[in-house]
UniProtKB/Swiss-Prot annotation:
Enzyme class: transferase
Documented EC number(s): 2.1.2.10
Source organism of this protein record: Cupriavidus taiwanensis (strain DSM 17343 / BCRC 17206 / CCUG 44338 / CIP 107171 / LMG 19424 / R1)
Protein name in the entry: Aminomethyltransferase
Gene label: gcvT
HAMAP family associated with the record: GcvT
Gene3D superfamilies in the cross-refs: Aminomethyltransferase beta-barrel domains (3.30.70.1400), Aminomethyltransferase fragment (4.10.1250.10), Probable tRNA modification gtpase trme, domain 1 (3.30.1360.120)
Family label: Belongs to the GcvT family.
Annotated NCBIfam families: gcvT, PRK00389.1
Length: 375
């Protein structure tokens, strides 16, 4: 099978990146030292090519009403242009089709950013719901492989870390209007070298920073100038350890079509209280929350917490969904789906290679803005 490639593929290879098959995409896992890339983001600034993710533009007078029924979170929270909202998109049974970010620009203009591996299915689902509801929304995917003919494709670079925003501003003065942005807000600016740039104060690392959406034709110039300014390229390996420390779910690992957001630590993204109806609402209300989604820290030596390991508790067995060795904490950490009745602070056991090792149950996240929140 031929892997898909982002517009930065040649640059990754020229930098000596170790490339891997990530859901059908040829992506960099690291550029030498995953640990150093991780610490660069926690302490300075790093950047990730996330152009495999897909921007989907929605337009038309009924767009808000359409999204009110499509998403589990309530887009009525979006009243200020540029405001962003994290949400799950569910099927009729309450399973997670995808988790995404929706941006509001005008009553007739919204933007979604969806995950790479689910993008084609997401677009099909959104189009089917649009047709079924008669909403008449214009749906325009902006990734190169799915963009309509004549529509310029977009690319995305995430610049993350305590010094990320300052380095973006110094490198691209056109982005200075983003100085006033609060987290989960975006602004669109015109840059003489890049063209139209969406600057979003969002990320997937637990650090401050921007996600920059630019024309695919301009992204190489963006990357090279940021690297020259001291922003360190970072791969999927560091992205995974950073998001795990930050308590951020990964679709396909921590939740999927078979998992309710209520069992994936995402109840805060679901609006069940308002009268608004949305796909999956009835199923969620009927099922409720069956399991807890909590963190684990391995206390015994001799193993690393990994996905699918069994967690043994007095209340019954649970399962790790994501696990790794945390570079920031120098401990093995994990997310786990655990039975009701397990409490933060409890000691549980994890089966690792036919051994039962002790772990402590903790509240997520583990690290935020460079500071450890657990011990």
């Amino acid at each position: 099978m031929t892997l898909q490639a982002t517009p930065l593929n040649a640059i990754h290879r020229a930098l000596g990146a170790r490339m891997v098959d990530f859901g059908g995409w040829d992506m960099p896992v690291n550029y030498g030292s995953q640990i150093e890339e991780h610490h660069a983001v926690r302490n300075d600034a790093g950047m990730f090519d996330v152009s495999h993710m897909c921007v989907v533009d929605l337009a038309g007078p009924n767009t808000r009403a359409f999204l009110r029924g499509l998403l589990a979170n309530n887009v009525d929270k979006l009243q200020t242009p540029g405001k962003a909202l994290y949400s799950c998109m569910l099927d009729e049974h309450g399973g997670v089709i995808d988790d995404l970010i929706v941006y509001f620009f005008a009553e007739d203009r919204f933007r979604l950013v969806v995950n790479a591996g689910t993008a084609v299915g997401d677009i099909d689902w959104i189009r089917a719901r649009n047709e079924a509801t008669g909403s008449g929304v214009t749906i325009t995917p902006r990734r190169e492989d799915v963009a309509p003919a004549g529509v310029p494709p977009l690319a995305i670079v995430a610049v993350q870390g305590p010094n990320a925003r300052a380095k973006v501003w110094s490198t691209f003065p056109s982005t200075q209007p983003s100085d006033a942005l609060k987290p989960f807000n975006a602004v669109v600016v015109q840059d003489p070298a890049l063209g139209e740039v969406m600057v979003a104060r969002t990320g997937y690392t637990g650090e401050d920073g921007f996600e920059l959406v630019v024309p695919a034709a301009s992204v190489a110039g963006l990357w090279e100038k940021l690297q020259a300014a001291g922003v360190r390229p970072a791969g999927l390996g560091a992205r995974d350890t950073l998001r795990l420390e930050a308590g951020m779910n990964l679709y396909g690992q921590d939740m999927d079509i078979k998992v309710s957001p209520l069992d994936a630590g995402l109840a805060w993204t679901v609006d069940l209280q308002s009268e608004r109806d949305f796909t999956g609402k009835a199923a969620l209300a009927a099922a409720g929350s069956r399991q807890q989604f909590l963190g684990l820290i391995l206390r015994d030596k001799g193993g690393v917490l990994r996905a699918h390991q069994k967690v043994i508790t007095p209340a019954g067995d649970g399962e790790i969904t994501s696990g790794t060795f945390s570079p920031s904490l120098s401990q093995s950490i994990a997310f786990a789906r655990l039975p009701q009745g397990v409490n933060v602070g409890d000691t549980v056991q994890v089966e690792i290679r036919d051994r039962k090792l002790n772990a402590t149950v903790v509240k997520l996240p583990f690290v935020r803005h460079g500071k450890a929140l657990v011990s």
